[in-house]
Every structure is written in structure tokens, then in C-alpha cells.
A protein has these predicted regions:
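Conserved SF2 helicase motif VI
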Residues: 34-35, 195-201
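A short beta-strand element within the Helicase C-terminal
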Residues: 170-171, 178-193
Length: 201
């Protein structure tokens, strides 16, 4: 049994499948992103066996296998609001015109390939894509990726980004966060809030 992106094997369906593979002589799970909790590690070790750290992320960066990382936090100030639910707060954030215009201007001003990650296709991804695409220069390519885009088309966009130096990719977290490696990526903008360690790494 080989499990790629093994950190996702904590879901009930995959745990159920793995527990039925009692005759599997070999079990290999590969991931670059555990969620940092001991429980998650124990679940994966119960499914695959002892874990081994083969190489560190900074070593992969030094060897040129991963894009080098530099984090800049841009803090936007909003007028204080109280929200009844988390969903109300999310809707406020993703529908905030000044915030979305800031993201658009930032993406258009940044030099190099830029990846913009969002969580909701219709509510945030499509409006951001339209905003950026309608204001870009003619020589700049903007791509929109979500779960409805065929895998081969996603791969084409990734390949274009490897050879381009000024593309913008507006992509959902589910399609372009874990397991995607674009070495020629210069900027990442987290357009939607997320506290998932795996998603952010």
C-alpha cells in the first residue's frame, strides 16, 4: 500500500480502508506536512508504521527542489464588527470590496508569478479572478483554477507557471495547496482565512 499525501489518511473512509488491509505486506505513506499534533502522528503511524523524517524543507529549498520562502504579513485594518457566527465573519471578509481591491492591486503590482489562494469558488474565487483579469495588462496571463477544472488543465497551468515569469494563478485551496510544487513561484497571497497548518504549508 502506498499513500501519497498521507496526512489526509486521518479521514474515516481512508482509516476504514487501511484497517481492512491486514494482509498488506508493505505500507508506505508519504507527506511533507503533518498537522503538528501528536494524535495525527499516532494515527498515521498506526496505519503505516513508524515515521521517518528523510529531509527538511529548508534542505529541499537549498537543493532547488522547492521554491524559497520569505513571509511578509500585510495587516489590513477593518472597522470593529461583532458577528453572530463564523460564517457571518467569513462572508464579511470575502465580500469586502476594499479588501478584494487591495488583493487585486497587490497581485497586479507584484513582479513574478503570483498564486492567489481562496476557499469559495463562487463567493470569492470567481469575483477575484474577474477583478484581476479585467484590470491586467495585455501581456499578463491570469488563470482560474477550481475543482471543476480538469486535472490535465491544472497541470498545464502549473507547467506554464514554470516557464512564465509574470503569470497570476487564482486557485482554490483544494486544488493548489498541498501536493503542488511550482519552483518558479515568486508570490503567494492567502486571500481567504485559514488556520489549517497543512493547508498553509
Amino acid at each position: 500500500m502506498v499513500g501519497d499525501e498521507a496526512h489526509q489518511f486521518k479521514s474515516k473512509s481512508l482509516v476504514s480502508i487501511m484497517s481492512k488491509l491486514s494482509d498488506a505486506k508493505y505500507r508506505f505513506g508519504f507527506t511533507g506536512t503533518l498537522d503538528g499534533t501528536q494524535t495525527h502522528k499516532w494515527v498515521l503511524e498506526g496505519l503505516f508504521g513508524a515515521s521517518y523524517k528523510i529531509i527538511k524543507t529548508d534542505e529541499l529549498m537549498k537543493k532547488g527542489h522547492l521554491a524559497k520562502l520569505n513571509i511578509n504579513i500585510l495587516l489590513l485594518k477593518h472597522s470593529p464588527n461583532k458577528f453572530e457566527t463564523f460564517e457571518d465573519e467569513i462572508q464579511y471578509i470575502i465580500g469586502h470590496n476594499r479588501r478584494n481591491n487591495f488583493i487585486k492591486n497587490l497581485a497586479l503590482d507584484l513582479k513574478g508569478n503570483t498564486l492567489i489562494l481562496y476557499a469559495r469558488v463562487e463567493g470569492h474565487g470567481q469575483p477575484l479572478f474577474d477583478l484581476i483579469n479585467n484590470n491586467k495588462s495585455d501581456d499578463r496571463q491570469v488563470f482560474f483554477i477550481h475543482g471543476g477544472v480538469e486535472t490535465e488543465n491544472r497541470e498545464k497551468v502549473r507547467e506554464i507557471a514554470e516557464s512564465e515569469n509574470n503569470a497570476i494563478i487564482v486557485a482554490s485551496y483544494g486544488t493548489f495547496s498541498t501536493g503542488i510544487n511550482i519552483k518558479n513561484l515568486h508570490n503567494v497571497i492567502f486571500a481567504s482565512p485559514s488556520k489549517s497548518r497543512i493547508r498553509n504549508l
